[in-house]
């Protein structure tokens, strides 16, 4: 019997990471055929990752997820469209700017851009580039959530904004600088990750539950896919015009 409330989430996090660990170990031992370097440090780091992921997810479930859903419900009940849309944008922006995957991508992109002489090879230039990239992606996610919330309120079909986003991506890709296209497409994949997905889903479901005539199943979902498309558009625009 698991009495400690953290034991079950800890085991769940371990099982989530187990396939990754298994792949790394199998290739290290059987394909590369080299001993695992610094085993003690590797084990300690893995335990830290599992514990950190466990605490992180538990913290979100206890605080931000219920808060996001309840605030969406309250805003919808009060009928203030302006503040609801403002909240949607700020929630999307705030979730994306704190997304660990976006931070990692921005830092890596800055290092590569510096090595390729696209930006100056100084820490200040790399920090500024990474910050600008993070803000661009976060702004794109904020806009996506705003439009997604407006879609739920107005009852628009989900494919309207999605088709428009795909059309913009297809039209912009041939004209975007080659050095930004890969970053733009990857930013779309990682923009909806650990923090963004649960918060955005909670917002959509809470809003669809509160609005009369909306179904949480058919109307509450669909925000995440749009939030993964707009960063591609905004990052390519950043590369073209900035």
Indicate where each model-derived feature is located.
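Structural signature of hydrophobic alpha-helical transmembrane segments
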Residues: 42, 46-54, 127-139, 187-200
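Helix-loop-helix junctions within the multi-pass membrane cores of secondary transporters/permeases
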Residues: 82-172
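C-terminal transmembrane helix-loop-helix hairpin of multi-pass membrane proteins
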Residues: 2-14, 39, 176-242
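Transmembrane alpha-helix boundary signature
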Residues: 56-67, 95-105, 178-180, 241
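Inter-helical loop and helix-membrane interface segments of multi-pass membrane transporters/permeases
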Residues: 1-7, 29-40, 106-131, 178-190, ...
């Amino acid at each position: 019997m698991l009495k400690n409330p953290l034991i079950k989430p800890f085991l769940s996090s371990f099982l989530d990471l187990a396939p990754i660990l298994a792949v790394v170990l199998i290739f290290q031992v059987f394909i590369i055929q080299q001993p695992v370097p610094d085993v003690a440090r590797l084990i300690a780091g893995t335990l830290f990752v599992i514990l950190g992921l466990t605490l992180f997810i538990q913290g979100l479930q206890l605080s931000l997820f219920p808060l996001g859903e309840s605030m969406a419900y309250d805003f919808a009940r009060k009928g203030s469209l302006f503040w609801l849309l403002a909240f949607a944008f700020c929630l999307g922006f705030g979730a994306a700017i704190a997304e660990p995957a976006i931070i990692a991508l921005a830092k890596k992109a800055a290092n590569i851009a510096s090595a390729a002489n696209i930006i100056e090879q100084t820490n200040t230039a790399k920090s500024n580039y990474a910050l600008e990239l993070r803000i661009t992606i976060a702004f794109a996610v904020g806009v996506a959530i705003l439009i997604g919330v407006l879609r739920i309120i107005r009852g628009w079909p989900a494919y309207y904004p999605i088709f428009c986003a795909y059309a913009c991506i297809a039209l912009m890709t041939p004209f975007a600088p080659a050095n930004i296209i890969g970053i733009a497409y990857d930013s779309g994949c990682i923009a909806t990750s650990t923090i963004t997905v649960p918060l955005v889903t909670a917002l959509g479901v809470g809003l669809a539950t509160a609005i009369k005539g909306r179904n949480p199943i058919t109307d509450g979902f669909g925000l995440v896919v749009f939030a993964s498309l707009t960063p591609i558009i905004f990052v390519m625009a950043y590369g073209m015009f900035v």
